[in-house]
Amino acid sequence: MAEPDYIEDDNPELIRPQKLINPVKTSRNHQDLHRELLMNQKRGLAPQNKPELQKVMEKRKRDQVIKQKEEEAQKKKSDLEIELLKRQQKLEQLELEKQKLQEEQENAPEFVKVKGNLRRTGQEVAQAQES
């Protein structure tokens, strides 16, 4: 590395830079605290560890706040969202009814199916003759 010019020159008019003193590192309290933290780390003790009960209580509180926010968001639904939900529920009910009817028809005995087909064909023939 290149050395600065002021090292070679013995010019008394120049102000030579000095290394700044870090007041935090020179303080006795900081040194003691640093030494204590190093010792605790070697032992495996972490200063930020909280008691288990406190952790559980904080987690419950966070969960409760999240649930409250979700409930408030659901309560603040707009009229459009409410109408869409109603329509969706109606469509689901209609689909369930259709499925029930199909299951009933599939589970019905064969003679009931044939009888229904005969009635329909009889009605269709009657309508065709009237037209």
From Swiss-Prot:
The modification N-acetylalanine is found at A2. It comes from Homo sapiens. It comes from the Eukaryota. Residues 61-112 form a coiled coil. InterPro entries: FAM107 (IPR009533). Transmembrane segments: none annotated. The lineage of its organism: Eukaryota, Metazoa, Chordata, Craniata, Vertebrata. Disulfide bonds: none annotated. Residues 39-78, 100-131 are annotated as: Disordered. It holds the Pfam family DUF1151. This is Protein FAM107B. Keywords: Acetylation, Coiled coil.
